[in-house]
Regions:
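Conserved alpha-helical substructure of the radical SAM core
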Residues: 2-156, 161
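Radical SAM enzyme [4Fe-4S]-AdoMet core and its adjacent flexible, acidic
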Residues: 1-10, 169, 178-291, 300-305, ...
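Radical SAM/AdoMet-radical enzyme domain recognition
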Residues: 98-118, 124-237
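A short, flexible beta-alpha/helix-coil linker loop
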Residues: 83-89, 173-175, 241-244
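A short linear boundary/processing microfeature
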Residues: 81-84, 164, 183, 328
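Accessory C-terminal segments flanking Radical SAM cores
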Residues: 271-362
Length: 362
């Protein structure tokens, strides 16, 4: 798939996402009005990306920004802690300042990047950056949060800035969630969902899928709980065993196939809910979308990385512009080597080919 073909496919995928979001927010006039407004913004963003494509630079539609290396939870098997993104001696140093993040957000809008996924660590620990994102009205910021800090002033921030979309992390029902995230976390998240729903906010949940919880998180019981809580977006993320002794939790090829089948059934069963699967949906887009094909990752310290699960970089946003980061020779090597745009059979491609990835930096 050429970059131009990928651009067309990504644009079509985003259009379907917007259409599905309109369906999901049909009973919520405020949310629907926001989606209709953003629909026009996204069309303008597509034109900007097409202009760059014509001049020889492929601009991804998405960014993933880990805005802090701090977190208030210690979740079992956390990729951010294992990769040094979050609260360890391997962290890259100081986090980017709010002014540096503002510049990144502004530059991203100018280049036509439509979505910026804010992660961490726990992103709500960087209130200054969240406020900065709220001011960037021409971009949608899904905020991937553990949910435990989403109360009081933060509720008001999300109410007043619809471009910030809370995405709360769950591992399944109470037993699965509290086992990985800590006692009492599930109840806190359920309370937050109730409050978000009362405020008529569009929000979602992110579910890390393992061999232990796969059947639970695709069950009717789990989905009914989310429906009653007002959740309209479910993002399934296949577990990546960054910690070697957790390899047994990673989905097999058969598990991935069964997960895909289960999600297809859920999409038909719950038409007013949006279901996304990562990296499962990538196989329909000619391979892994990392390294700037569809997205890239910015670490808390500013490293431009192909993917959160592959924390290797040759450029840092404290030294280069966002455009220069996108034009990274390392990213180009990843794409031209076939590591990201080859056949995608499921699972995290770059994590599985870690040695090949590191060799490209030599």
């Amino acid at each position: 798939m050429t970059t131009r073909e990928l651009n067309i496919y990504m644009n079509q995928s985003i259009e379907r996402l917007i259409k599905n979001t309109l369906k999901a927010t049909f009973a919520n006039p405020q949310a629907t009005a926001f989606v209709l407004k953003m629909q026009k913004v996204i069309v303008e963003a597509q034109k900007k990306r097409e202009n760059y494509e014509t001049s020889g630079t492929h601009i991804p539609a998405f960014l993933i920004s880990s805005i802090t290396d701090n977190c208030n939870l210690f979740c079992s098997g956390c990729y951010a802690r294992s990769n040094g993104i979050c609260g360890t001696s391997k962290s890259t140093g100081e986090n980017l300042s709010v002014m540096q993040w503002k510049q990144i957000f502004t530059d991203a809008v100018e280049m036509g990047i439509s979505f910026n996924l804010l992660a961490g660590g726990e992103p709500l620990l960087r209130k200054d950056v969240i406020f900065a994102a709220a001011d960037v009205k021409n971009m949608i910021f899904p905020v991937f949060t553990n949910g435990t800090l989403l109360q009081g002033e933060y509720l008001d921030i999300f109410v007043n800035n619809r471009n910030l979309i809370p995405v709360l992390s769950l591992e399944g029902e109470q037993n699965e969630t509290d086992k990985r995230r800590g006692n009492g976390v599930y109840d806190k998240i359920m309370l937050v969902m109730k409050q978000l729903n009362a405020k008529k906010l569009f929000f979602g949940t992110s579910v890390t899928v393992t061999t232990e919880n796969r059947q639970t998180v695709t069950s009717t019981s789990f989905l009914e709980t989310l429906q009653k809580s007002g959740c309209k977006l479910v993002i399934y993320v296949e577990y990546v065993p960054i910690e070697k002794d957790t390899a047994y939790l990673a989905l097999t090829n058969k598990d991935c196939e069964e997960l895909d089948q289960a999600i297809d059934i859920l999409r038909k069963q719950y038409e007013s809910t949006i279901f996304l699967s990562f990296p499962g949906d990538e196989k329909y887009m000619g391979g892994c979308l990392a390294a700037g094909r569809g997205f890239f990752h910015i670490s808390p310290g500013g490293n431009a990385e192909a993917c959160p699960f592959s924390p290797y970089s040759d450029r840092n946003l404290t030294q280069v512009s966002l455009l220069e980061a996108i034009q990274s020779p390392f990213f180009e090597k990843l794409r031209s080597s076939g590591l990201v745009d080859g056949e995608h059979t499921g699972g995290c491609t770059l994590f599985e080919k870690e040695d090949d990835v590191k060799n490209l930096l030599l």
